[in-house]
A protein has these predicted regions:
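Short, intrinsically disordered, charge-balanced linker/junction segments flanking boundaries
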Residues: 70-75
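RNase H-like nuclease fold core
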Residues: 1-48, 52, 56-69
Length: 75
């Protein structure tokens, strides 16, 4: 069973304002990076940026065949 840890974060400069988000997906056993990405979102709120990062990371976990996911975020 593939277990992974998802770290996600997003933010905006202003609320709303220019925003971005990113995530890293790590194999929980080895610490190997399974996926890593970030992007500019355009104008968005800080909440949209945070949740976008989380959802994007979870989609990548599903695509990587992760069966158990531990998500970690600062919000």
């Amino acid at each position: 069973m593939l277990e992974a840890i998802l770290h996600s974060d997003g933010g905006s400069r202003g609320n709303p304002g220019p925003a971005g988000c990113g995530f890293e997906l790590l194999d929980a056993t080895t610490g190997d990076v399974l996926a890593l990405a970030g992007t500019f979102l355009g104008t968005a709120s800080n909440n949209v940026a945070e949740y976008s990062a989380l959802v994007w990371g979870m989609q990548n976990a599903l695509a990587a065949g992760v069966q158990h996911l531990s998500a970690r975020a600062d919000s």
